[in-house]
Every structure is written in C-alpha cells, then in structure tokens.
C-alpha cells in the first residue's frame, strides 16, 4: 500500500508539472481527494525519493519530453486501470483522465484509442513478436528525429526592409 501512496503523491506533482493546472480548481480538488484517500501526505511516502518527477525533469533539460511523457502517461493509465473498481475515488480518477485526454492527446479520441491499444499489445505472444520484428525496418525511420531539409532563407536587407548598400560595390554607392 505504501508504493501506491507514493505513486499517487507523485501523480499530483506530475500532473501539476505537465499541465500547469494551478488555475483548474476541480482538477486540484480531485488530486487532493486522491492524496487524502491514499494518505499520501504521510512522511513515509517521501522515502527513496521521487518515482517519476526527477526522470521527467532530466528529460526536459534535453527537450525530448514526448518520449518520456508517453511512458509516464502509460504508467498512470495502468495505475488508474488497477484502481478502476474503487468507487470512493472513481470520480477523481475520471477527472484526471479527462484532463490527460485534453492535454496529452489534444482531445483526440483516435489518439487515445491508439495509445491504449499499444499499451495492451501482449509482447510475450510469439505472433506479435514476429509481426513487430517484420515491421521494425518500416517503423524505425519514423521514430528518428526529423532533420530540417530546408534551410531558412535570410533576408538580404536590414530589418526595416530598406535597400542596404552592398560593400565594395561602387554602383550601389552612387
């Protein structure tokens, strides 16, 4: 039960950090409800340091947050699935899931369904393994960072848009 408390305490930190939800009263209330339910304000919750927050912060330094955010969101969806039958906190979980849906999936049900579908693929199934390896060569190029093939053109004149004389060109100075 202590690990569950720790996880939900970090849920508060992570959700606030990811969504900037300081002005969203109902979301904060629901997170506070979960904290109270799991007694996550207890001193033993902090033992061993943060579970997810430090990892997220270290990835933000590099600017590659989408990868780790998707793993963290996946973690929370699994956590919420494990807590699904608990009626005392179901409304809080639904509110937080709705906020994640808007912020992480841009309110796209298709993206949410694809995400959930990916998290439920049984990786121990030999048929799934064969299909995944077969598709690997096609998938890998889409996973690498995109290099900008087009370079931005620079303006030939100064900020004001006026004509600027070219150095060492007598015709432009006359």
Swiss-Prot record:
Gene3D superfamilies: 1.20.1250.10. The keyword Thylakoid does not apply. Pfam families: IFN-gamma. InterPro entries: 4_helix_cytokine-like_core, Interferon_gamma. Keywords: Antiviral defense, Cytokine, Glycoprotein, Growth regulation, Pyrrolidone carboxylic acid, Secreted, Signal. GO terms for molecular function: cytokine activity; type II interferon receptor binding. It comes from the Eukaryota. Belongs to the type II (or gamma) interferon family. Type II interferon produced by immune cells such as T-cells and NK cells that plays crucial roles in antimicrobial, antiviral, and antitumor responses by activating effector immune cells and enhancing antigen presentation. Primarily signals through the JAK-STAT pathway after interaction with its receptor IFNGR1 to affect gene regulation. Upon IFNG binding, IFNGR1 intracellular domain opens out to allow association of downstream signaling components JAK2, JAK1 and STAT1, leading to STAT1 activation, nuclear translocation and transcription of IFNG-regulated genes. Homodimer. Interacts with IFNGR1 (via extracellular domain); this interaction promotes IFNGR1 dimerization. This is Interferon gamma. It comes from Phodopus sungorus (Striped hairy-footed hamster). The gene is IFNG.
């Amino acid at each position: 039960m202590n690990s569950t408390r720790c996880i939900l305490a970090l849920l508060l930190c992570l959700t606030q950090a990811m969504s900037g939800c300081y002005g969203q009263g109902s979301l904060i209330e629901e997170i506070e409800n979960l904290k109270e339910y799991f007694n996550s304000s207890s001193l033993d919750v902090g033992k061993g340091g943060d579970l997810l927050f430090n990892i997220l912060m270290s990835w933000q330094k590099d600017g590659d947050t989408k990868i780790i955010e998707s793993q963290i969101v996946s973690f929370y969806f699994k956590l919420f699935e494990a807590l699904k039958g608990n009626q005392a906190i179901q409304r809080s979980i639904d509110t937080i899931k709705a906020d994640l849906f808007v912020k992480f999936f841009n309110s796209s049900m298709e993206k949410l369904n694809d995400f959930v579908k990916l998290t439920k693929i049984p990786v121990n199934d030999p048929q799934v393994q064969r299909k995944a390896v077969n598709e690997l060569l096609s998938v890998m190029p889409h996973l690498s960072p995109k290099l900008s093939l087009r370079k931005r053109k620079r303006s030939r004149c100064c900020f004001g848009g006026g004509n600027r004389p070219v150095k060492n060109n007598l015709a432009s100075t006359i």
